[in-house]
Amino acid sequence: MTSPEEQNVSEENIEAVEELVAADAVEVVEEVAAATLAPIVLDRPVQTVGRRKEAVVRVRMTPGTGQFKLNGRTLEDYFPNKVHQQLIKAPLVLVERPESFDIIALLHGGGPSGQAGALRLAIARALIEVTPDDRPALKRAGFLTRDARAVERKKYGLKKARKASQYSKR
């Protein structure tokens, strides 16, 4: 092992390095402060609609603290499944504003999965109205695409939409 004297390290060099590190740290802090998102100010609540399968969701979004009111209930009460909760919060997390808005939603029709998908679409559409700059990121993530898949109708003469009774040649 070599001693600091042998490495030709003086206190002046150490102080110079410390000053450079401190200056870099100040620059990083300033960049982070500039990068933090400005608070949202809206003159009126944003209202949007989302649809998926048979579900229709109307969303009213206002600046707030991240509260969800779904048919008068909290997000955890209405959607006990964590997968649905993550699906719904995904657009807010993507634009880094998970606790910037209060969301009041009226959901009807369909089941939990369809309602969760419809709510995600409605929230993504509302975010675009608030900050149009987020559109490319939301589009790339696929949050603005209406999922057109729905149950195919049953046809007469068949048991289900496409299932037929077994064919007998003779």
Swiss-Prot record:
UniProt cross-references to Pfam families, sorted A to Z: Ribosomal_S9
InterPro entries documented for this protein: Ribosomal_Su5_D2-typ_SF, Ribosomal_uS9, Ribosomal_uS9_bac/plastid, Ribosomal_uS9_CS, Ribsml_uS5_D2-typ_fold_subgr
Single Gene Ontology MF annotation: RNA binding
Any GO BP annotation: translation
Alphabetical UniProt keywords: Ribonucleoprotein, Ribosomal protein
Disulfide-linked positions: none
Gene3D superfamilies documented for this protein: 3.30.230.10
Transmembrane segments: none
GO terms under cellular component: cytoplasm; small ribosomal subunit
Keyword Ribonucleoprotein: yes
UniProt entry tagged with the keyword RNA-binding: no
Family affiliation: Belongs to the universal ribosomal protein uS9 family.
HAMAP family (alphabetical): Ribosomal_uS9_B
PANTHER family for this protein: RIBOSOMAL PROTEIN S9, SMALL RIBOSOMAL SUBUNIT PROTEIN US9M
Protein name: Small ribosomal subunit protein uS9
Native organism taxonomy: Bacteria, Bacillati, Actinomycetota, Actinomycetes, Mycobacteriales
Gene: rpsI
